[in-house]
Amino acid sequence: MNIKPWIQAARLRTLPLSVSGIIVGSAYAYYQGFSDWRIVVLALLTTLGLQVLSNYANDYGDGVKGTDANRIGEKRLVAAGIITAEQMKMAVIITSILTFIIALLLIYVAFGKENFALSLIFILLGIGSIGAAIKYTVGKSAYGYSG
């Protein structure tokens, strides 16, 4: 299996912006005396997972709908036939699962067992984030096409 198309579909140029908030927030937490390297690493990995998931889902959604057929600029891999829609759909599923697992680890490290209610809120937010990343261009009610 050639990994180069998957790296291209991940759109590496979008990743620095996605982690910038985590870096700034972690720097501020460190400045305030609240720092745990495990939380920083897991937050970075969760954010990167969500961004790659969003990019894969966008490539899949636009490719299936034909939105990228006449695209000018950087080609999208499903539309170009380099990655099949079925392969990209599987990548979206796998990336969703891995990102959710990392997010669960982050929530556990950050809140522990004693803050179950707060953990539950963040688990629901994580599920919502994964759903939003996918629904941007996937499905009949994709919000990326409205307005």
Regions from the PLM with identified roles:
Residues 1-42:
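Topogenic membrane-insertion module of multi-pass membrane proteins
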Residues 10, 62, 84:
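Residue-level signal for inorganic ion chemistry
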Residues 49-74:
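Acidic (Asp/Glu-rich) catalytic motifs at the cytosolic membrane interface
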Residues 76, 80-147:
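Intramembrane alpha-helical segments
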